[in-house]
Amino acid sequence: MHLATGLAVALPFIGAASAQYFPPPVEGVTVVESKFDKNVKITYKENDICETTEGVRSFTGHVHLPPNNNDFGVNQNYSINTFFWFFEAREDPKNAPLSIWLNGGPGSSSMIGLFQENGPCMVNNDSNSTTNNPYSWNNKVNMLYIDQPNQVGFSYDVPTNVTVNPINDEVTVADFSNGVPEQNNTLLVGTLGSQNPYATANNTQNAARSIWHFAQVWFQEFPEYKPNNDKVSIWTESYGGRYGPAFTSYFQEQNEKIKNHTITEEGEMHILHLDTVGIINGCVDLMEQATSYPDFAYNNTYGIKAYNQSQYDSMINEFYRTGGCRDQLIHCRDVAAESDPHFYSHNETVNKICNDAGDFCGQKLEDAFESANLGFYDIAHPLNDPFPPQFYKGYLSQAHVLADMGMPVNFSQASDAVWKAFHTVGDYGRGDVRGYIDDLAYLLENGIKVALVYGDRDYICNWFGGEKVSLALNYTGTENFHKAGYTDVKVNSQVGGQVRQYGNFSFTRVYEAGHEVPAYQPEVSLEIFHRIMFNKDIATGEIDIAQKPDYSTTGTADTFHIKNDIPPEPEPTCYVLSMGRTCSEEQVKAVKDGTAVVENYIVKSPAGKKQGPPPTSTSPPSPTSSSEGSVKEFSVSVLGVSVLAAITFFL
C-alpha cells in the first residue's frame, strides 16, 4: 500500500492556551547509567498525568543507546533515544504480568494506543485535561508503551529545530540562528528528531534488532520495575501485524542464543520470558491479505459497496494476472531470500524490486477505495473521520504536560523519516527472515500464545485478511484450528463478536469496531485482553487454557453470515492538528486564509457538514486513475496532500 508521507505534529497551534514554541526546560529527571556500558543510560521521571488512580505509579523516559550499538551488519551510526511510558497495574503490580504496546505505521507513535484506545486516560475536548479510563489495559497488567523505531513520537536521534506547515503537515529542518519566526495558522515551530531517514531503522527486522537492545537495558536496569511475575507479552496493531511476529520471534531466537551461549556479551544475556503476541487489526502479510481489500470493499457484513462488479473484477485481475501483484511479490521474496537473507536491506536491487512490488499492489488493489469517500479505518464512517478523537495531540503539546513528562523534544504522531526509510527498501512487500506468518507458527511451536483480534469495520487491515492469515499458519495445531468453529464472545450480557480458538491460537472478529478496536469496544476489548493474558478461553473466560491445552471452540465454519447495521454518522469535528484527516475543503481553506474560528484546536466556524450514508449500491463513483509510481491526489487543490497522507499511515 502507499503509506502516508505527511506528519501530524502536535505542536502548539496559534491562539491555543499556553501556546509555546519549544519544550520547557527538562527538570527533575533521574539518570541511571548502565552498569554494563557507561555510554548507555536511562533517563526517566515519575509523573501523575494520565494515570491518576491513587497509589498507581507511572514513569516517562528514554533509553539512550550510543552509535554502533546494534547488531553486526546494521549500519547504526546515530544515537538512539527510545521513549517509553510505563504504567504499573492498578491491581497487584508486583505480581502482574507485563505487556509492551506498539502502534504501527511504520512510523506511528504508541501514544495513539495509549490515549485513543487502551491507556489509563482519555483526553477531553479541551485538549488540556483527561478523564480516567475504567477499561484501561493497566487494570491488571503492567503496561509499557514504546515509541519506535528511532524518531517516532517522542523518540529521537538528535534534537533538531523544525518548522511545520499544519495545512499539509510538512516538516522542514530549520536554522533559527537569525531568530525564530512567529507562529501563525500556516507555520509552527518546535524541536523533533533530525528528520534524517538514515538515522532510524529502515525495515521491520532491523527495528526488531533495535528494540531488543532497548529491552535488554530496560528490563535489567530500569529501577522502578522489579516484578515477581517476569512474563512479557507484546501487543500491537496495524503495521504491528509485522512488528508483533518479527519482534517476538527475534526475542525468542535471542533467548535461545543466550541459553546455548551463542550470546555471551555482558548486559545482553537477559532472557525475556515471552507469553503472548497479540495483534489488533494487523497487516501481517501482503501476499496473503492483498485480495482482501477489494473483497471487503465490495462485499462486507454491513452491505456497504465501495465498488461495482467491473471495478472489483479489475482489481482481482491485477493480483492474479501475469506480472501482477502476486507475481511481483513472489519475485521480491525470491530475490530477497537469495541476495538479502538476513534482511539488512543493503542490496539496492532487492530494495527496488520489493519497493516496486509493494507500490504496484497498493496502487492496483487499494488506492481506488478513495473514490468511495469512506473511512479507511472505518468503512461505515466518512473519509474525514472524527473518531477516535485526536485531542491527545493538543494535550501532548501543552507546556505543563511536556514538563511533567520531562521531554526534551516536541511530540509527533507519525515520522515521515521512518516511513521513507521503510518504503525505500520495500519493507511492505517483503517478509522478514522467516516470514511473518511462519514467525507466528514458530511462536506457537514454542508455547507462546498468538491472538489475532480484528474489528469488522476496518478497511485498511480488515478482518477478511486477518482470517486468511489465521488459516495460512502451518504448525502442529493447524488441522485442529481449522476444525474449530466460530462461537460467540460473551462479555457480561452482550455478545461482542465471534472467535475461533484452538489452544493457544485464536482469531476473533469484534463487532461494530473499526481499526482501533479498543476505542470502539473498550469493555469487550479489555475482556478479550484479560482472557488471553490470563490463559482463559476467549468465548466465555471460564475455561483455563493452561489446564486444557487442547481446548477448541465449536460452531460454524465461518462468521460472514452474521450481518451488521450501518451506524449513524458521527458529528464532524475539524481538528487543526489533524486537518488532512478530519477537515473539509472549506474548513482547511478558512484555516489557511485566517478566517476560521478555532477553539482548543477545534474549528468552530465554518462548521462541518455530514457526508451522508455510505453507498450500498453497486455504482459508487469510478476510481480516478493515477500514473504509474504516483499516489493519487485529492481533486481539491487547497489540501495539497494525497489521500493516504490524509489517513496518516497504518496506525
Swiss-Prot record:
Residues 626-651 form a propeptide. Residues 1-19 form the signal peptide. GO terms for biological process: proteolysis. GO terms for cellular component: fungal-type vacuole; plasma membrane; side of membrane. Coiled coil: none annotated. It is found in: Cell membrane. It is a lipid-anchor; GPI-anchor. Extracellular serine carboxypeptidase that contributes to pathogenicity. One of its GO terms (molecular function) is serine-type carboxypeptidase activity. Keywords: Carboxypeptidase, Cell membrane, Disulfide bond, Glycoprotein, GPI-anchor, Hydrolase, Lipoprotein, Membrane, Protease, Signal, Virulence. It comes from Arthroderma otae (strain ATCC MYA-4605 / CBS 113480). Its main location: membrane. The active site is at S238, D458, H515. Belongs to the peptidase S10 family. A lipid is attached at S625 (GPI-anchor amidated serine). Disulfide bonds join C50-C121, C325-C361, C332-C354. This is Carboxypeptidase S1 homolog A. InterPro entries: AB_hydrolase_fold, Peptidase_S10, Ser_caboxypep_ser_AS. It is an enzyme of class 3 (hydrolase). Substrate binds at C461, E516. Glycans are attached at N77, N125, N128, N161, N184, N202, N260, N299, N308, N347, N410, N474, N504. It catalyses: Preferential release of a C-terminal arginine or lysine residue.
